[in-house]
Amino acid sequence: MKHKNDLKIKIDKEPKKKDNILKRIVIIAILLFIVIFVLNKAENYLKEKTANEINLVLNNKNVTANLKHEIIEEDGNIYMSIDDIKNYFDKYIYIEDEINEIVTTYDKQIASIGFETNKLTLNGATKKIYAHAIKKDDVIYMPIVEMKDVYNLETTIVENNVILDSLTRKQVKAYAKSNLSVKWKADFFSKTVDKIERGDVVVAIEEKDGWTRIRTENGNVGFVKSTKLTNYTTTRDDWEEEKQITGKVNMFWDYYSKYVQAPDRTGQVIEGVNVVSPTFFYIDSNGNLKNKIGESGKKYIEWAHSNGYKVWPAIQNDEAGIKVTSTILNSYTKRQELIENIVDVCVEYQLDGINIDFENMYQADKDKFSRFIIELDPRMKELGVVLSVDVTAPDGDANWSLCYDRNVIGHVADYLIFMAYDQYGASSTKPGTTAGYNWVETNLKKIIEYDEVKADKIILALPFYTRKWKVNSNGELVEKPSVVSMLNIKIPNGVEKQWNEDLQQYYIEYADGKDTVKMWIEDGTSITSKVSLVSKYGLAGTSGWRKDMETSNIWTIINTELQKASN
């Protein structure tokens, strides 16, 4: 049997052991905290993750850690991978097999660079450079400094930092009042990433809560107290392209064949209109760009400009046909020849814009048509010429609908024009409306939501016509429908118009012998409903197909609705 005193001794010793363990834990925790604090806060102790690499500082941000491949140096040249160029500069960059060169576009530039010779082709002109594209470890690299004119860059190389500044972005510089430590964070206890001396020039990026984020001459980015900087100077402002049209676009196509002269519109003033698109140009059966301007076309341009209308002529491919169009689209050389010819006519006739109206193309050529638009766009921007591209409704025929990549076209071109008509067209096997409101809205939403085209880049094209359908007692078509201009719609005496709420238009039918005539009416009422979509979805405006098919009240109706949408 244990003595009571022995039990007491054991009980007294247990708390002392626990106290010692607790003290040790506290001491270890304090030491760990001190070590972590020193490692994270002590000046210049921590090295950047990218300290041993070539760092890329793009528009005041070190993006090295986000690159797919390292920046490399070969023979004194700095190279950036094509994958990273695609990420930061040109999502559409690609290797053109026909010429074995990389083709890239950016803003007002289209360029190609090869793998063997030190030359760069920029907007059609070739110049000598000091490097070419290379392939290393199955990765394609481009000499980024040599590409500065393509991507509008100011390039600086300091030690292991490659500094790229977009010339279209605002830049503010300032002077250091005294010797300073540049901090990783806006905190005196943060680690130092660089040191600057009194009088050093820095790029002032942004100011917040008494601290200014800066970039040093070495390319390092960090924070200093705002009071330690002086003599702020804006060396460059943000550059934004001015829109040619203020407010909503109110446009029409002015069609005429190559066998007649351009319309004489002398003395005409069309209410609210600010853009005209005469069908001046076409691709012939040999794939050549032809113009039918002549003296009458020159007078047309003078008339339009005298009224303040911008001239965006259409280029059509209907005469070329699907095969010739395919031949052009599938050849880089032929695309560039066509683009050079378009540039020439834009300069010669002082055009304000170009409307690409290519229809009936192979679905297989969808990406090639997109390439044509991608390559045409910078050349038009270089001239200050607006690029608009016509597309049909999604989810239709392979050669009339599925041949367009509306997402790419909408991203690249200034305007995507949705030809919101021919819901039931010449090839339809049953009668129907030319452009029912519900169909127009449904397809418009597809373009905005599914194809992700910004609404303010979409011009809604309206039909100034309908079709006259004739069916037998079985409801079968007895002949191809005829096009009837809005101006020439005739409703026989005694025939009542029937309103269709979904279509937002009137419908008529009447007997013609043993057959029945059916017509869905396009008039001021139906046009008003469709134009209201501009306001509802924030669209860029409207265009009418085509001039001289409309009734006299249409321009007042369109102008009124567009004015509402502009407010």
Mark where each language-model region is.
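Primary recognition of N-terminal secretory signal peptides and signal-anchoring hydrophobic helices
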Residues: 2-209, 235-242
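Glycan-recognition patch characteristic of GH18 chitinases/ENGases
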Residues: 232-341
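Short, acidic/polar
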Residues: 255-271, 330-348, 398-407, 522-535
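Conserved, mostly hydrophobic/aromatic
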Residues: 276, 356, 416, 460, ...
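Substrate-binding surface in catalytic domains of secreted glycosidases
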Residues: 286-295, 340, 363-492
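Glycan-binding loop/region signatures in secreted carbohydrate-active enzymes
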Residues: 464-530, 559-567
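Acidic/aromatic/glycine-rich contiguous surface patches that form carbohydrate-binding/processing clefts
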Residues: 530-567
